[in-house]
UniProtKB/Swiss-Prot annotation:
HAMAP family: HTH_type_WhiA. The keyword Transport does not apply. This is Probable cell division protein WhiA. Belongs to the WhiA family.
Amino acid sequence: MALTAKVKDELARLPVTKTCCRKAEVAATLRFAGGLHLVGGRIVVEAELDTGAAARRLRTALAELYGQHAELAVIAPGGLHRGNRYVVRVSRDGETLAKQTGLLDGRGRPVRGLPSQIVSGGVCDAAAAWRGAFLAHGSLTEPGRGCTLEVSCPGPESALALVGAARRLGVQAKSREVRGVERVVVRDGDAIGVLLTRLGAHDSVLAWEEYRVRREVRATANRLANFDDANVRRSARAAVTAAAKVKRALEILGDSVPEHLAAAGTLRMVHPQVSLEELGALADPPLTKDAIAGRIRRLIAMADRRADELGIPGTEAALVGELP
């Protein structure tokens, strides 16, 4: 199950007993998932949700808190929606319900943000509002290049209200407009974990953290692999460079090169790709990494001094065209 579906399923089954919290959740769900419609001169309250569990939760809450019998309709997949959509609709006494849930104020005017009792309420009300908003239009991406928990909002006022509710929960959220839609976004991985915990999605938090850890382990392994590859490439380039310079050094020095330096240089030319440690092991008798490297350095330095005396190109001349 995708993370978004997992979170919504868990939140839709979360038992909540406090009336104020249940009302805050219902108000937010209606605000973010639906709206008001005028049908035959009557106000109809409607909410469209993407999970059956969330729709049934809303329908039950409307009956228990407000005594409203809501219709539940299922819309088959089509257009941009790959799965079923669930519409919860209250046609009878819709205006009364709209006022009770804060969709309309006392004078019957639309409320653009969240009801004042949520905005000025406690932490539990803020968490309930976020729970309703996420059930309505929330999404959670799996940790990857960027972690994102996002809620699409019906307008800037509701987005700002949701940002304020997040602040009361100790979470930094930002509001932004994307392709004409207001969205509230939480990007920090730790903040997402805190928010999910506040909403009551404890099992989902564990799954989220497991995804994060797995992603970080993979990223660390990739960094180490890239680091190792880079080291191998650097070592190989250095070995090829040394082999080319050694060949030129032996040409410059001819028979005057000391035997032990000539032996070290010959080993490097014969085995241009091996590491210094492996090269030392091939010597007779075996040499340490530092010892074989020192002999090769002295051979090249001796050849460069001799080239200066003779006025001819030194060992660097051997590198032209040798390396990419």
